Swiss-Prot record:
The gene is DPPV. It comes from Trichophyton rubrum. Residues 269-291 are annotated as: Disordered. It is found in: Secreted. Its EC number is 3.4.14.-. GO terms for cellular component: extracellular region. This is Dipeptidyl-peptidase 5.
Length: 726
């Protein structure tokens, strides 16, 4: 009943100013990247929408007309997990998650103009995804990825034998990574071939593991690796994949290589950029990513960092010739931005890259032979770029993107021309109605060492003559940013439409503003970033009349959670009515319990046992800091967060309770560093927004705002009195 009551209240209040509710946010359609056909006439994309009444998320695939932006349904079959163009007109290959092989998938072939008339080409004996295709004579070679057994077979969970014991035994790191205990299975790229007979293709079920022959290699690399970690040459004969350096400790170093291997696996894969190798530029030992073959297959572009233990070092474009021993070339190596993806133009002369720049994911172009000091040119588009694909053989690309004001922006972008809008979700979806760029603006403030950027996000129906409490949202990372991006978890617009003006700062440590700002947080977590936040708060307090700082709140996750815990023990903590710390560190020395040791060993200038003073310097649990605690605080921490153990949140809550500080602990036993399940996300929003609304006064000024009591989950409260009542 509570959930139903809350839904009714939310809808009723929408006309009064709170237009965008958590339920709108969670149930709004989610669309994937749009992939154009070879001729550049149609694009296919995935769409899903959560239904709170039925507790399910049906999904399907749509077609986008690249001339007029019209959208038509291709299929509503939720079992179709991915679709890719065959390379022959409008014919497609798709993977169906249900198959006659238990635990396997089916490979099907159809035509986008007659999708129902499909036929099955064959089965894959296990979970398989990330298809990439290339014609090789009268055959079609493909690659994809799945889990590998130690013997190199595709792992099939449904067919696997149940272990006689639940014990795990380790002789090396990782023990666990992100949200999973590391097991004997690992990701691997597999190759196969579609053979043509008459007018149909068939697959014999035989796959070749291209990764397993390299001991300790893994590709795509978890937890976020996918099809961008490998590529297939246009003639279908050569595969490139990225793996962390097999010979180095993966938990301590970020070093990774780009491997080349024949599609048929006739030779063992070899790295082209091995550390201290004959082709590798001197001093380049960091993480590699985004391998992409040139159209003629003679060159391969990829991105690589220099530092061997720093996941946020600047990426530089590298180009290697295939089949030679010539040194790898660095392209535009002095460009002070960190590219994230790279692609070749159809003539192989121009590179298109995405990179974050001033809190926006932008698209750039540069010559494939650009010199070190070359500055790439920006291609005009709206919002931030998530992915892009060339439209036929033209210079134009189809961009799939998003922004702070829309969760899907499909547009055509061409160098030196205005962009052309195809479909913007906020103009189509009723859940996003009213959202737009007019409620977003940048703010620049003099920080501790340089000017610091923030986003200001205003509520629907904003009136500059009224006053709104401040919602001060601190991003994670710490080497991350509040970008002009749509977040499916921490969405500033959801907070704003409770009746706040959101200020989302990008303090020292943030990405996209030059490498120096990113690097300057090293061994200074509670130093310059905290001072930046103080200066931003002071500027808002002194100069922005429509923001009420006296009733403001602060919230953050991950590093943002740490910063909230740090703020609680500082003078700034007394400026807020309430705090929210999600998955933040509390005790300095507990950082050794994390998974990726390279992260803390870089950020604190040494190992836990050699540089202990650096870990202790920014310890939120210091007695002199805890003595200052008084601001009501909600603590959120989840059981499957293996980056920051749930004990961090429990310990923080223990101290808040014993101190008599009004506090609450929110825990999801089935969530990780993030809360992603729809029903859990709704409860998260009810609790987090209900908490800040209670203490900021929003509940009093707006009786239809979210309240803690709107959440249907019963609160555990075993004691009638606090510790200090006795």
């Amino acid at each position: 009943m509570a959930a139903a009551k809350w839904l009714i209240a939310s809808l009723a209040f929408a006309s009064s100013g709170l237009a965008f509710t958590p339920e709108d946010f969670i149930s709004a359609p989610r669309r994937g990247e749009a992939i154009p056909d070879p001729k550049g006439e149609l694009a296919v994309f995935h769409v899903s929408k959560y239904n709170f009444d039925k507790k399910d998320r049906p999904s399907g695939w749509n077609l986008l007309n690249l001339k007029n932006g019209d959208i038509n349904v291709l299929t509503t079959d939720s079992d179709v997990s991915e679709i890719t163009w065959l390379g022959d007109g409008t014919k497609v290959v798709y993977i169906n998650g249900t198959d006659s092989v238990k635990g396997g998938v089916g490979i099907w072939i159809s035509d986008a103009k007659n999708f129902g008339n499909a036929y099955k080409a064959g089965s894959v004996n296990g979970a398989f995804s990330g298809l990439k295709l290339a014609k090789s004579g009268d055959k079609i070679n493909f690659v994809g990825y799945g889990q590998s057994t130690t013997k190199g077979d595709l792992y099939n969970e449904a067919a696997a034998k149940e272990a006689v014991s639940s014990a795990r035994i380790y002789d090396s790191l990782f023990v666990r990574h992100w949200d999973t205990y590391v097991g004997t299975q690992f990701n691997a790229v597999f190759s196969g071939t579609l053979t043509k007979s008459g007018d149909k293709y068939s697959f014999d079920g035989k796959l070749k593991n291209l990764v397993q022959p390299v001991k300790y290699a893994e590709s795509p690399y978890p937890p976020f690796g996918g099809s961008g970690d490998y590529d297939l040459s246009s003639d279908g004969k050569t595969v490139a994949f990225m793996s962390k350096a097999p010979e180095l400790p993966k938990a301590n170093l970020t070093t990774s290589y780009i491997f080349l291997v024949p599609h048929d696996g006739s030779r063992v894969a070899e790295p082209i950029n091995k550390r201290n190798g004959p082709r590798t530029p001197q001093g380049i030992e960091g993480a590699s990513s985004s391998p992409v073959f040139s159209p003629d297959g003679k060159r391969i572009a990829y991105l690589q960092m220099a530092a061997k233990n720093y996941e946020s070092d600047r990426r530089v474009i590298h180009i290697a010739e295939v089949g030679t021993n010539k040194p790898v070339q660095r392209i535009a190596s002095n460009w002070d931005r960190s590219p994230e993806a790279v692609k070749w133009s159809s003539d192989g002369r121009t590179l298109y890259v995405t990179a974050e720049d001033h809190a926006t994911g932008k698209l750039f172009t540069l010559p494939a032979d650009a010199r070190d000091n070359h500055k790439p040119a920006v291609v005009k588009h709206d919002g931030s770029v998530s992915s892009f694909y060339f439209i036929g053989s033209s210079k134009s690309v189809l961009i799939s993107g998003n922004s702070l004001w829309s969760n899907a922006l499909y547009q055509v972008a061409t160098p030196d021309r205005p962009n052309r809008k195809l479909f913007y979700a906020n103009e189509h979806d009723p859940e996003l109605k009213g959202l737009g760029p007019n409620d977003i603006e940048p703010l620049w403030v003099d920080g501790a060492r340089t000017k610091i950027h923030s986003w200001i996000v205003k509520p629907t129906g904003f009136d500059k003559n009224k006053v709104y409490p401040l919602a001060f949202l601190i991003h994670g990372g710490p080497q991350g940013s509040w970008g002009d991006n749509w977040s499916t978890r921490w969405n500033p617009r959801v907070w704003a439409d409770q009746g706040y003006v959101v200020v989302a700062p990008n303090p020292t440590g943030s990405t996209g503003f030059g490498q120096k700002l990113t690097d300057d947080i090293t061994n200074d977590w509670g130093g310059a970033p905290y001072k930046d936040l103080v200066k931003i708060w002071e500027h808002v307090h002194d100069h922005i009349k429509y923001i009420d700082t006296d009733n403001g709140i602060a919230a953050g996750a991950s590093f943002g959670g740490f910063m909230v815990n740090w703020i609680q023990g500082q003078d700034l903590g007394r400026k807020f009515k309430a705090l929210v710390s999600h998955d933040g560190t509390f005790v300095g020395s507990s950082k050794i319990g994390t998974d990726e040791l390279f992260f803390i060993e870089h950020d604190f200038n040494g190992t836990f046992f050699e540089a202990r003073q650096n870990y202790d310097r920014w310890d939120c649990s210091k007695p002199e800091l805890v003595a200052k605690w008084s601001t009501p605080q909600l603590v959120v921490h989840n059981d499957f967060d293996f980056r920051l153990s749930v004990a961090e949140g429990v310990g923080l809550f223990n101290v808040l309770q014993e101190k008599g500080v009004p506090s609450r602990f929110l825990n999801f036993p089935d969530e990780t560093h993030w809360v992603t399940k729809p029903e859990n996300s709704l409860v998260w929003h009810q609790q987090v927004l209900g908490w800040v609304n209670k203490w900021s006064g929003i509940n009093k000024s707006n009786p239809k705002s979210i309240k803690l009591s709107d959440c249907p989950i019963e609160v555990v409260d075993h004691e009638a009195h606090s510790y200090f009542d006795y």
